[in-house]
């Protein structure tokens, strides 16, 4: 947009320079002689005329209306009008007539397929209405530059300044006084420059300016030529210089509207040009009586000539106020309709396509197709070009045969309908689809909405999808005999495709099978038969339908709907939800409250193009619009169905609501429901209607369905791109959350495995501890038994010692048996000694045993001390887990 505005400004600047160059080149030649021959006392006529007009606005408007013309914009306060005689009226009418004749002459035809030259276009637009050559005019100005300098020196003399000052002071509100009061910075030289310009201003320049304003006012209705008061005050407050005067003069003439510029550069716009009134402009009042405060722009000097001054366009009122004018609305609608017929001055057809593709699905679809084509190799592009040529030749042959049908007297109803088709438009589509899609998307949408003629439907589809190529036919022939893993599944699902004839069933199987081999990532998904069947029916052979299917999948983005995970389908469902929320928030919120998701009922709509429900003829009309606008247009049909059934849907509960969405949502377009239809529906009910069931009990109104979807739901690529961004952002956030949850699940699983391992190790240690405790208890019992044996041995030793002492005591007593024979005593003593020795030996052995047992006791005591601490720890663990395995062990230590 900024480039368009800059070009318009440059065009306005060049146009103003052309007018001024023409004026100066015609009048500067005689300027020197006039000034030299004029005495100083006659400079009174050149004095600055006061700004107050002698004719009021009402008088001027009444005079214009008395001649049968529209009242022009107030020029007396805005436009510089030089001094003229009584012949102004005739000159003005002649100039206006010449200008109108030149404007109505169409310029050379523009080839839309070639890139535009901005500089060349601007030059042509400027020269066309005026018949001028800018370079020649500048050369003429350069030749007269010296004369102009001499003229300024003569007028700038002290005598001339005095005369000018006197004359200026004699006026009611002179310009010199105005400049002194307002700015206080104007010099005498500047005042002389202004006075010279007032005299030198040619009559024709002012007339052309006025007439040009009048013509512009009639063509571009609604453009207010009155200056903004704030801008005017700002200009008047500043210092008055030659640059300010030039800028103000240029500002007073409004810029040439874009529509008029385009009309001059296109032969097809003669109707729009003819809309300009052909009546001559009404005569203006004598210019010596009209006040002026500014002079036209002086010829530039030196380097200033290379830099044209910037124009200041008049500020129009707000759009809301201008839309109140019926003429402005009419002109706005004409400009909107013709915006596709004219190539803008930006100089590039691609730039127009890029801007249109942001708001129009047709232009967006063509841009995507072009991008896919540019990515292909040279051989592929040549093959596609050959396919395009073949389709065009096929269409030409069909038209030739069609002309022969016109010669037949007796034709049936179908042939009559065929003759009513706008074959000239479809010929234009076939020959140059790029131009039609780029410049006339609304016209193309209207024709496609009414339906592509069945006789050329396959040709148009292949041209739009750019799918016809010898390369794709060779691929089909090569893969036809290749084995497929999905053969049984394909044959089973094809039995559900009821609108395909038996003789076409095998061909349909081959097409789907070859595609599953051609694209192994997609393979085969249930629902492909509904997509491939209409293609096969409208193509000449299987190879063409295969190429068209590949084009839909690859170029139109249908492949993403059938990939594993169906990312494209999820995106379309999200876009459907957002569009439904935008068009009917109440219905969307109702579905959310009931827990109804679009995945429950809308997936088959997008996967089968509604073919699972509607008859073949109905589906073909949907395919027509899909090929021209893309699969995004399915969102229009889906949202339209929901909006038409909104009143019923908001009243149902979950179960009934889900059943209605699956089975009864399409009943709105049954022919039997026309009693409740609107006026538009009744008007379309006379169109095509197709049966919904084989028994013919129901029939659908396809024209009404398509018309409602295309006019009732407005979708732009910009909106879909915004929804795509939202979906990607949400999906990325969900993916990050899912990744985080997955990492937590993995970490949790690892921790669980560690816990299980620790529990296993703990069970092993627990078993070892239990065995050690049991062994400790057994040792404790053994120790107690040894202590008992020790005590018994000690008691035995004590008894033996007492016996020995008793025996010794007895021996020390007087032997009453001394009288006994010595031999007996000796033997008894020996026996006693030997017995004593034996007892001593046994006693030594017992003491050694006691020593050993004491050592064992000490060792067991040490072990017992160590085990006591271990037992206390185990006892606390057993209490924590509710186990009572150490109760007996504690009793032992007590």
Swiss-Prot record:
Biased composition (Polar residues): 184-200, 268-279
Gene3D superfamilies: putative rabgap domain of human tbc1 domain family member 14 like domains (1.10.8.270), Ypt/Rab-GAP domain of gyp1p, domain 1 (1.10.10.750), Ypt/Rab-GAP domain of gyp1p, domain 3 (1.10.472.80)
InterPro entries, per database record: Rab-GAP-TBC_dom (IPR000195), Rab-GAP_TBC_sf (IPR035969), Rab_GAP_TBC_domain (IPR050302)
Listed GO MF terms: GTPase activator activity
Cellular component GO terms, alphabetical: cellular bud neck; cellular bud tip; cytoplasm; cytosol; Golgi-associated vesicle; incipient cellular bud site; mating projection tip; plasma membrane
Keywords: Coiled coil, Cytoplasm, ER-Golgi transport, Exocytosis, GTPase activation, Phosphoprotein, Protein transport, Transport
Modified residues (Phosphoserine): 25, 30, 389
Coiled coil: 732-872
Residues covered by region (Disordered): 1-324
Cellular localization per UniProt: Cytoplasm; Bud; Bud neck
BP GO terms, sorted: endoplasmic reticulum to Golgi vesicle-mediated transport; exocytosis; protein transport; vesicle-mediated transport
PROSITE patterns: TBC_RABGAP
Main location: cytoplasm
Basic and acidic residues composition bias: residue spans: 1-23, 134-164
Positions of post-translational Phosphothreonine modification: 89
Domain Rab-GAP TBC: 451-630
Other remarks in the entry: Present with 1940 molecules/cell in log phase SD medium.
Assembly, per entry: Interacts with GYL1 and RVS167; and is part of SEC4-containing complexes.
Listed name of the protein: GTPase-activating protein GYP5
Species whose genome carries this gene: Saccharomyces cerevisiae (strain ATCC 204508 / S288c) (Baker's yeast)
Gene: GYP5
């Amino acid at each position: 947009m900024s480039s368009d505005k800059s070009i318009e400004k440059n065009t306005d600047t060049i146009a103003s320079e052309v007018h001024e160059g023409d004026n100066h080149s015609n009048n500067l030649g005689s300027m020197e002689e006039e000034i030299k021959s004029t005495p100083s006392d006659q400079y009174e006529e050149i004095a600055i005329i006061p700004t107050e007009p002698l004719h009021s606005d009402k008088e001027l408007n009444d005079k214009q209306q008395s001649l049968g013309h529209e009242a022009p914009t107030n020029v007396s306060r805005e436009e510089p009008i030089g001094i003229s005689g009584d012949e102004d009226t005739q000159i003005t009418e002649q100039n206006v007539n010449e200008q109108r004749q030149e404007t109505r002459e169409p310029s050379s035809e523009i080839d839309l397929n070639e890139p535009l030259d901005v500089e060349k276009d601007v030059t042509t637009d400027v020269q066309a209405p005026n018949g001028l050559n800018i370079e020649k005019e500048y050369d003429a100005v350069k030749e007269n530059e010296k004369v102009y300098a001499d003229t300024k020196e003569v007028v700038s003399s002290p005598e001339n300044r005095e005369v000018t000052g006197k004359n200026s002071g004699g006026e009611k509100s002179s310009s010199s006084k105005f400049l002194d009061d307002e700015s206080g910075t104007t010099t005498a030289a500047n005042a002389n420059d202004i006075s010279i310009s007032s005299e030198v201003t040619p009559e024709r320049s002012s007339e052309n300016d006025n007439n040009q304003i009048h013509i512009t006012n009639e063509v571009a209705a609604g453009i207010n030529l009155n200056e903004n008061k704030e801008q005017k005050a700002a200009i008047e407050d500043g210092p008055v210089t030659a640059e300010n005067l030039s800028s103000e003069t240029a500002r007073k003439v409004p810029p040439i509207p874009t529509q008029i510029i385009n009309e001059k550069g296109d032969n097809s716009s003669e109707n729009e040009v003819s809309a300009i009134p052909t009546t001559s402009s009404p005569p203006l009042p004598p210019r010596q009586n009209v006040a002026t405060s500014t002079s036209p722009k002086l010829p530039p000097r030196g380097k200033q000539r290379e830099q044209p001054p910037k124009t200041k366009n008049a500020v129009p009122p707000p759009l809301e106020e201008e839309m109140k004018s019926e003429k402005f609305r009419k002109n706005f609608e004409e400009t909107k309709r013709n915006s596709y017929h004219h190539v803008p001055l930006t100089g590039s057809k691609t730039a127009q396509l890029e801007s249109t593709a942001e708001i129009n699905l047709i232009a967006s679809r063509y841009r995507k197709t072009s991008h896919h084509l540019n990515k292909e190799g040279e051989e592929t592009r040549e093959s596609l070009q050959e396919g395009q040529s073949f389709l065009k030749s096929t269409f030409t042959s069909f038209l030739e045969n069609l002309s022969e049908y016109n010669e037949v007297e007796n034709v049936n109803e179908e042939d009559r309908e065929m003759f009513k088709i706008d074959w000239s438009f479809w010929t234009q589509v076939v020959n140059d689809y790029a131009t039609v899609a780029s410049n006339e998307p609304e016209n193309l949408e209207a024709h496609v909405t009414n339906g592509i003629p069945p006789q050329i439907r396959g040709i148009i589809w292949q041209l739009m999808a750019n799918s016809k190529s010898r390369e794709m036919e060779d691929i089909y022939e090569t893969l036809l005999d290749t084995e497929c893993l999905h053969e049984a599944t394909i044959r089973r699902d094809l039995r559900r495709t009821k609108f395909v004839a038996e003789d076409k069933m095998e061909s349909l199987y081959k097409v789907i099978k070859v595609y599953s081999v051609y694209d192994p990532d997609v393979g085969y998904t249930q629902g492909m038969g509904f997509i491939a069947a209409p293609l096969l029916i409208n193509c000449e052979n299987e190879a063409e339908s295969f190429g068209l299917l590949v084009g839909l999948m690859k170029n139109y983005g249908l492949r993403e709907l059938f990939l594993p995970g169906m990312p494209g389908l999820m995106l379309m469902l999200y876009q459907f939800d957002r569009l439904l929320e935008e068009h009917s928030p109440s219905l969307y919120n109702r579905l959310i409250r009931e827990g109804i998701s679009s995945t429950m009922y809308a997936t088959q709509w997008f996967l089968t193009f509604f073919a699972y429900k509607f008859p073949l003829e109905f589906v073909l009309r949907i395919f027509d619009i899909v090929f021209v606008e893309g699969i995004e247009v399915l969102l229009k049909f889906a949202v339209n169905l929901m909006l038409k059934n909104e009143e019923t849907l908001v009243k149902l509960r979950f179960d009934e609501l889900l059943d209605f969405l699956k089975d009864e949502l399409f009943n709105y377009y049954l022919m039997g429901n026309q009693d409740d239809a609107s006026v538009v529906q009744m008007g379309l009910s006379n169109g095509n209607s197709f049966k919904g069931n084989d028994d013919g009990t129901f029939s659908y109104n396809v024209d009404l369905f398509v018309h409602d979807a295309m006019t009732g739901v407005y979708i732009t690529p910009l909106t879909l791109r915004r929804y795509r961004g939202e979906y990607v952002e949400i999906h990325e956030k969900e993916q990050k959350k899912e990744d985080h949850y997955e990492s937590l699940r993995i970490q949790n699983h690892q921790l669980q495995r560690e816990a299980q391992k620790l529990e296993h190790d703990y069970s092993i240690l627990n078993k070892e501890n239990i065995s050690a405790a049991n062994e400790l208890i057994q040792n404790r019992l053994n120790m107690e038994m040894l202590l008992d044996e020790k005590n018994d041995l000690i008691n035995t030793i004590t008894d033996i010692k007492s016996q020995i002492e008793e025996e010794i005591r007895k021996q020390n007593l007087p032997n009453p048996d001394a009288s006994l024979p010595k031999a007996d005593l000796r033997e008894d003593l020996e026996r006693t000694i030997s017995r004593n020795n034996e007892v001593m030996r046994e006693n030594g052995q017992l003491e050694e045993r006691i020593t050993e047992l004491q050592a064992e006791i000490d060792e067991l005591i040490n072990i017992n001390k160590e085990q006591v601490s271990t037992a206390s720890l185990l006892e606390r663990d057993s209490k924590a887990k509710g186990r009572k395995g150490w109760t007996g062990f504690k009793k032992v230590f007590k």
